Curated annotation (Swiss-Prot):
It catalyses: beta-D-fructose 1,6-bisphosphate + H2O = beta-D-fructose 6-phosphate + phosphate. It comes from Listeria monocytogenes serotype 4b (strain CLIP80459). Pathway: Carbohydrate biosynthesis; gluconeogenesis. This is Fructose-1,6-bisphosphatase class 3. Belongs to the FBPase class 3 family. Pfam families: FBPase_2.
Length: 653
């Protein structure tokens, strides 16, 4: 045995000092590895739509209701199943309603507790007692453990079991216990959650989604293009902050900044009212997708703010393009293509009339130079993002749980794309003097995204990393954007639709090719035959015949459009994916009404399951990434056991 092995085994022996303890731990590990694989739940592109997100999270994409049918399908009718499901999703709110509607509340408590315990026993059966115990609320842990691991059908245990429940009811703790059981069931039906990007965008409550995720028991996060914009703003990027405000103004969603995060936009409002007071800002009128009741004065002010921050954004983008020639974005230096006297712009060899040619803050000789007032304003805005504690807490969580991509249990997860040439080869990009492509490119993007947040303000490293974060939002070789260019300016200022075109990276055509998908999987160290790519970012237009299952099942696109704006386009309210011990299931969801409707009328999101891949042999924990680590631990312990038995190490009894 090598010296290094003995050194390691001596350390291991401190934790397992006897043959008995070592053998027991090996048996425990083998037992865990033989349990069924836990359920993975994949969500993508939530876009701030908290109500629908919360419902899908609470119902486990329909898993809770399926488990209820498994246990009580022959005993309960559909109405009773819906009622029990709603209770589990929203226990406190549902019990408030039932308390006023139920004649014999004591009997209802008793029946409900029996059912919830039986259901909880069922969903806990694939986990170790230790794992279930850790998931239990502290106040009820002992009682729950007693109830979950007793067989109350046996006569000698039945009285003991019923007495516990009767005491819970008589002591006035039934509602708290029902809530505890419901939340435990929610937690046990999904072992691990993957968010494949874009909590943020135009939806009203990304902050509530972040709060929920921060309290979730087990998850990871693959950053999306909208997430990266907020991360850049929180890192101190002026251009990212300007983009965040512009998008929020465009979709009448400034409340997320002012009310949810406490970022004051008063300096922007005062600036806009002064500089654009005589400007109708016709082409900067916000989109009122939610039909919220705003006064004309409010809309007028928001339109001015919208235009003011947009011009600042275009100037800041020009600064970056000019100082980062390696980004190869000179064609996006649009402010210098404007004829300010004629009110026209030259784009790709053609001249176009500008819809709006009122630019009071632009110096035609130095179009990217901020005025003193603009510089002061964007400084205040950037400081507000950096000093917002709640936003910083959310962004720190994104950094701690997130990444550009993830390999997990043989699958590859990423939000946007892997930049490809037409021939399927990986596109290269030079970063800090070195060329990167494929996996190494995404790894470098991740390193620089982290540097943008942690590097000291004012350093050249910080400035470069922040510029890269902006490039990830808008650049042609960005794995998060996936298009040739972002034509934001043209959409505001040029009527001709031909100028609005954003050509997709060849990846989006090639991802239908099974060989390309296998090539990508192998680039990331995965088995091209067995693995899958889980992708978000682009809404799947099911209404036009598009399928989320591509490349013979190798590519699964799970952005079905949580954002309400996409519902007409997609005919859906989103896709989620489930990966359990039996295989992969894609779940498509119809639009959600409201939480209040779900609680009162027991409506659920109508979901349709599609089995993508069924396992011939049920997957066990040993077949997962965690299983590989446990197997390695077991092998190390077997070496320790041999060392004890061969006399190389002595037991410490």
């Amino acid at each position: 045995m090598k010296t290094i092995d003995m050194k390691y085994l001596r350390l291991l022996a401190k934790e397992y000092p006897t043959i008995a303890k070592t053998a027991t731990e090996i048996i425990n590990l083998e037992a865990i590895m033989n349990l069924p694989k836990g359920t993975e739940h994949f969500l993508s592109d939530v876009h701030g739509e908290y109500s629908a997100f919360e419902q899908v999270l609470r119902n486990g994409s329909g898993v809770v209701k399926r488990k209820i049918r498994d246990i009580f399908g022959a005993e309960l009718d559909d109405a009773e199943i819906n009622s029990l499901s709603t209770l589990i999703y929203y226990p406190e709110e549902k019990m408030d309603l039932l308390a006023s509607e139920t004649e014999d509340l004591q009997a209802w408590y008793r029946t409900t507790l029996f059912r919830l315990i039986e259901l909880c026993q069922y969903v806990a059966s694939k986990y170790t007692r230790s794992k279930v115990r850790k998931a239990m609320p502290e106040d009820f842990a002992y009682i729950l453990e007693e109830l979950l691991h007793e067989n109350y059908n046996e006569d000698d245990k039945k009285l003991y079991y019923e007495e516990i429940l009767q005491h819970i009811i008589s002591l006035g703790r039934a509602e708290e216990f029902i809530s505890a059981l419901s939340l435990l069931i929610q937690q046990l039906v999904v072992d691990h959650l993957h968010i494949v990007g874009d909590v943020y965008d135009r939806g009203p409550y990304p902050d509530k989604i972040m709060d929920t995720l921060m309290n979730y028991h087990s998850l990871d996060f693959q950053w999306g293009n909208h997430d990266i914009l907020w991360m850049g703003a929180a890192s101190g990027s002026r251009v990212c902050a300007a983009n965040v405000i512009r998008i929020s103004a465009r979709y009448l969603n400034l409340d997320i900044l002012e009310d949810s995060y406490g970022i004051s936009l008063r300096p922007l409002a005062l600036f806009a009212d002064e500089v654009y007071k005589d400007d109708p800002c016709t082409y900067f009128q916000p989109k009122n997708e939610e039909n919220i009741n705003y006064s004309n004065a409010e809309i007028t002010q928001i339109a001015r703010m919208h235009k003011a921050i947009s011009i600042i954004q275009f100037k800041l983008e020009g600064e970056i393009i000019n100082r980062r020639k390696e980004f190869d974005m000179d064609h996006r230096l649009l402010l210098q293509f404007i004829d300010y006297k004629k009110g026209t712009i030259h784009l790709k060899g053609k001249e176009y009339l500008l819809l709006d040619s009122h630019f009071p803050t632009i110096n035609p000789e130095k179009p990217y130079e901020l005025t003193d007032a603009e510089r002061e304003l964007i400084g205040k805005i950037t400081a507000a993002f950096k000093n917002c504690r709640r936003l910083q807490k959310h962004v720190q969580f994104l950094y701690s749980k997130g990444s550009m991509f993830l390999t997990y249990n043989g699958n590859l997860l990423y939000h946007g794309c892997i930049p490809l040439h037409e021939d399927g080869t990986f596109m290269e990009m030079k970063l800090r003097g070195e060329k990167y492509a494929g996996r190494s490119l995404l790894e470098q993007f991740e390193i620089l995204t982290r540097e943008a947040y942690v590097r000291p303000t004012g350093t050249k490293e910080k400035k470069y990393a922040c510029d890269i974060v902006w490039y990830l939002w808008t650049g042609a070789i960005s794995s998060l954007f996936g298009k040739s260019e972002m034509t934001t300016f043209e959409r505001y200022f040029v009527a001709e639709k031909e100028t609005h075109t954003e050509e997709k990276n060849p990846y989006y055509k090639l991802r239908n090719n099974e060989l390309i998908c296998k090539q990508i999987l192998e680039e990331f160290g995965l088995d091209g035959e067995c693995g899958h790519i889980i992708n978000g970012h682009t809404p799947v237009k099911e209404g036009k015949g598009e399928s989320p299952i591509k490349a013979n099942g190798k590519m699964l696109v799970i952005d079905g459009g949580f954002a309400k704006a996409y519902h007409k386009e997609t005919n859906l309210a989103g896709y989620t994916l489930l990966f359990n011990s039996y295989g992969l299931q894609l779940v498509s969801h119809q639009p959600f009404t409201t939480k209040e409707d779900a609680i009162k009328n027991e409506t659920d999101i109508l979901s349709t399951r599609q089995v993508i891949e069924m396992e011939i042999n049920r997957k066990r924990v040993r077949d997962t990434d965690i299983g590989a680590k446990l197997s390695e631990q077991a092998e190390d312990l077997k070496l320790l056991l041999d060392a004890y038995r061969n006399g190389l190490l002595h037991e410490n009894r």
